[in-house]
Amino acid sequence: MIIYKDIFSNDELLSDAYDAKLVDDVIYEADCAMVNVGGDNIDIGANPSAEGGDDDVEEGAEMVNNVVHSFRLQQTAFDKKSFLTYIKGYMKAVKAKLQETNPEEVPKFEKGAQTYVKKVIGSFKDWEFFTGESMDPDAMVVMLNYREDGTTPFVAIWKHGIVEEKI
């Protein structure tokens, strides 16, 4: 298994269990799901309707995003202006790190990052933002949105802002 860790905070952000797809050469998007946690009935994959039950969330259980829950991501909030301020600083830090470690990737990163940030800004109200467990303000902010179907959530993490660790 491969764990994707933030290059600045070392927080675990995602794993290869979520089948991440590379977009614009700079961002990994991985579909995730809303799942029940808590309560005492763990019928993964069971069909409660066929068992005479119902599909409601059990008492003591809550619906959570599986990636957010598994990697203990912490929700944070931005308005457009504060997001742009954050992302400019973050991109500058990633670019500096790339120039040390992989300078030939810098032009690809700059072009792709600019394209993806425009996409985020264009639909800003639809995005949710999360920090890693350490809540490091200089680290990556994981972005969450929904696919065109409106029901499938996905997270987006910056390819050049992570290190892959095999476990």
From Swiss-Prot:
Present with 27800 molecules/cell in log phase SD medium. This is Translationally-controlled tumor protein homolog. The modification Phosphoserine is found at S9, S15. Its main location: cytoplasm. The keyword Protein biosynthesis applies. Keywords: Cytoplasm, Cytoskeleton, Microtubule, Mitochondrion, Phosphoprotein, Protein biosynthesis. It is found in: Cytoplasm, Cytoskeleton; Mitochondrion. GO terms for biological process: cytoplasmic translation; negative regulation of autophagy; negative regulation of microtubule depolymerization. Involved in protein synthesis. Involved in microtubule stabilization. It comes from Saccharomyces cerevisiae (strain ATCC 204508 / S288c) (Baker's yeast). GO terms for cellular component: cytoplasm; cytoplasmic stress granule; cytosol; microtubule; mitochondrion. Belongs to the TCTP family.
